[in-house]
Amino acid sequence: MLPEQGPQPSTMPLWCLLAACTSLPRQAATMLEEAASPNEAVHASTSGSGALTDQTFTDLSAAEASSEEVPDFMEVPHSVHHKINCFFYLEKQLCQLPSPLCLSSLLTLKLKTTVPAPGRWWSFQPHKAFPLLVGTPGSWQSTIDPAWAAPSQPSPG
C-alpha cells in the first residue's frame, strides 16, 4: 500500500466542494437552533446576495394584541415563525447544491424540523415539503418514474 497522502491537486476542487456541502447541514441545524433568539440569526445569515427582506418575517404584534382567547395548541410563539423563516432561507440555499446533495440535505433538514399539527398524521407531500425544489404539484409528478410512483396493489395470485 502507498503511504497516505493529502488530496492530489486534480482532486482539490472535489474535496473543497465535498467539504462545503457537508458543512451546510450542520450550519442549517445551528441556524435553526439559534433562530429561537428573535431576528438576529436570520438577519446576520441573510446579508448578501439573495437575502430575504424584512417583509418575509411574520409580524405577530396584531395577533398578540388580540383579546380573543386562543387554545394553547393554537398559540404560535414568535420563535416558531422565526424558525420557519430560517428554514425557507436554508431551503433556498440548499437548492443551489448539486441534485443528490440537495435532496439529501433538504430531506435531513425537513425531517429534523417538521412536526405534525396536533391531531394530524405524519405525511410526506413533495410539493409542500420542497416548494422551491419541485414547484407545483403538476410539475413534480411528471418527473417521477411511473413504475415507482404507481400505487401499490396486491399481486393477483
Curated annotation (Swiss-Prot):
Chief location of this protein within or outside the cell: secreted
Subcellular location: Secreted
Signal sequence interval, chain numbering: 1-30
Keywords for the protein's UniProt record, in alphabetical order: Secreted, Signal
Cellular component GO terms held in the UniProt record: extracellular region
Protein name: Uncharacterized protein UNQ6126/PRO20091
